Each structure stands twice: as C-alpha cells, then as structure tokens.
Amino acid sequence: MNPSEMQRKAPPRRRRHRNRAPSSHKMNKMMMSEEQMKLPSTNKAEPLTWAQLNKLTQLATKCLENTKMTQTPESMLLAALMIVSTVSAGVPNSSEETVTIENGP
C-alpha cells in the first residue's frame, strides 16, 4: 500500500437536522376563529330523550340479532352509530322504527 491509500479518509459531513414544523407565527395565521369555522348550514339538534335512547338500544339489539353477532358494549355502540348515521343520511328504509327515532316518540 502506498502512503496515500493509508491516509484515513474523513467521515462524510452530516447534514444538520431541520425542524420541519411550521413556525408559531405561521400557525397563528392558520388558526381560524370559531365563527369562521361554522357553516351557515349547521343546524342545532334537540337533546335526545330517554325514550329515543331506549328505542335506539332496541334497534341496535335487533340489528345485532339479525347479523348474529354477540352483544358486547363495542358492538352495541357500533350498531347504534350505524343506525344514527343511516337515519341522519336520509337513507330510505321501510322500517317504522327508524322513523320513530327520527321524529321522536
């Protein structure tokens, strides 16, 4: 080996780590007020009554029985959310029970 090959090579220079998060000044500009976030089509819903909650529980139970799933708290919650989302989306259903939840007892 000749002396030039024996020289120790310098390690490659490391790049400095740059913080990729936006600065707080930019974040303050991005923040919107609550009034700006509200859409004109936002409607307030009436509070849920106990009768509606009981009916929702019955529908969720019936849904789980139809699908032959076990009644766990998690599956009951998912069934109730499915029913609420179906009713709020306005999906037509021939069942009178969903109309009862939609219009109240």
Swiss-Prot record:
Superkingdom field: Eukaryota
Motif (Nuclear localization signal): 13-20
Chain residue ranges for the region called Disordered: 1-41
Protein location: Cytoplasm; Nucleus, Nucleolus
Motif Nuclear export signal: chain residues: 50-59
One term of GO molecular function: RNA binding
One Pfam family this sequence matches: HERV-K_REC
Gene Ontology cellular component terms for the protein in this record: cytoplasm; nucleolus
Chain segments annotated as transmembrane: none
Basic residues biased stretches: 10-20
Chief location: cytoplasm
Keywords tagged on the record: Cytoplasm, ERV, mRNA transport, Nucleus, RNA-binding, Transport, Transposable element
GO biological process, one term: mRNA transport
More about this protein: Despite functional similarity, Rec shares almost no sequence homology with HIV-1 Rev and HTLV-1 Rex.
Subunit structure: Forms homodimers, homotrimers, and homotetramers via a C-terminal domain. Associates with XPO1 and with ZNF145.
Job description of the protein: Retroviral replication requires the nuclear export and translation of unspliced, singly-spliced and multiply-spliced derivatives of the initial genomic transcript. Rec interacts with a highly structured RNA element (RcRE) present in the viral 3'LTR and recruits the cellular nuclear export machinery. This permits export to the cytoplasm of unspliced genomic or incompletely spliced subgenomic viral transcripts.
Name of this chain's protein: Endogenous retrovirus group K member 16 Rec protein
Organism (species): Homo sapiens
